[in-house]
């Protein structure tokens, strides 16, 4: 907090974080910039999309590119009953979540699939075969009050960029009525599926026309999730901060 208070320029990952900090740092007149700190290089955002698995087996295939944050084994079982598959990536994730995986397999049968870590250069080709990808699932309880916000409310999960690269609709629980940064962005760009429960999610995922539109929206906006897209604006911001502090030398 002291660092932000004394900084000549401030960078925030999103407007919600900015508003949260400004409750405490007071001085709102210094230069600021909005930029997510986890944006990958644009070179990973290739055009090599794969055919959808669902086109061949007529099931729904979802992916978690990291830990299944907020998903319980029983949720995976309920997904399976709606013929929705979960593909879980990451060797470390599978090791750390081994007990969770055992429980999920007991109730999901053939609907839980484990995959090794996917390198950034393979994001598009690997993940684009799925119908949608999971963000972080949680129930917000801030009721629109900044002081009640938790990190889940204010955070942009890093996997948003991974899913955007592959053009995948993003799955997140509907926390309408609360301040949730990722949900605001999803609604603004039309890049996700916000659901109240698993049956609601299943119904939305099986609406192929609507899901295709969301997928197209993600592909349209995916460059916004690269660092390259924002590099010039960041450089301009640095120049703005320097100019605001420039001391004229005596002649």
Region spans (language model):
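A charged, aromatic-enriched C-terminal amphipathic alpha-helix characteristic of glycosyltransferases
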Residues: 196-246
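Conserved catalytic-core segment of nucleotide-activated headgroup transferases in glycan assembly
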Residues: 39-128
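Short, well-ordered alpha-helix to beta-strand connector turns
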Residues: 6-8, 83, 130
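A short, active-site helix/loop in glycosyltransferases that binds the activated sugar's phosphate group
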Residues: 1-32, 43-44, 95, 99
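Nucleotide-sugar-dependent
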Residues: 118-165, 171-180, 184
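Well-ordered beta-strand positions
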Residues: 8-9, 132, 169, 191
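Carbohydrate-associated surface elements
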Residues: 16, 37-38
């Amino acid at each position: 907090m002291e660092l932000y208070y004394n900084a000549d320029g401030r960078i925030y990952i999103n407007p919600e974080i900015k508003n949260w900090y400004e409750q405490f740092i007071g001085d709102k007149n210094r230069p600021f910039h909005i930029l997510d700190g986890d944006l990958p290089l644009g070179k990973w955002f290739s055009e090599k999309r794969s055919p959808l698995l669902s086109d061949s087996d007529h099931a729904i295939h979802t992916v978690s590119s990291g830990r299944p944050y907020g998903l319980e084994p029983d949720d995976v079982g309920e997904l399976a009953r709606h013929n929705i598959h979960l593909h879980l990536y990451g060797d470390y994730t599978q090791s750390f979540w081994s007990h969770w995986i055992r429980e999920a397999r007991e109730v999901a049968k053939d609907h839980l699939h484990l995959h090794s870590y996917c390198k950034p250069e393979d994001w598009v080709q690997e993940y684009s075969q799925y119908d949608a990808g999971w963000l972080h699932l949680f129930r917000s309880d801030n009721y629109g009050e900044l002081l009640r916000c938790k990190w889940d409310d204010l955070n942009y999960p890093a996997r948003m960029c991974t899913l955007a690269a592959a053009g995948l609709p993003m799955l997140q629980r509907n926390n309408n009525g609360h301040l949730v940064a990722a949900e605001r962005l999803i609604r603004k760009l039309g890049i996700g599926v916000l659901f109240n429960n698993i049956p609601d999610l299943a119904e939305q995922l099986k609406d192929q026309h609507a899901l295709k539109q969301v997928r197209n929206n993600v592909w349209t906006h995916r460059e916004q999730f690269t660092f390259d897209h924002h590099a010039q604006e960041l450089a301009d911001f640095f120049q703005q901060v320097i100019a605001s502090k420039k001391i004229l030398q005596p002649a």
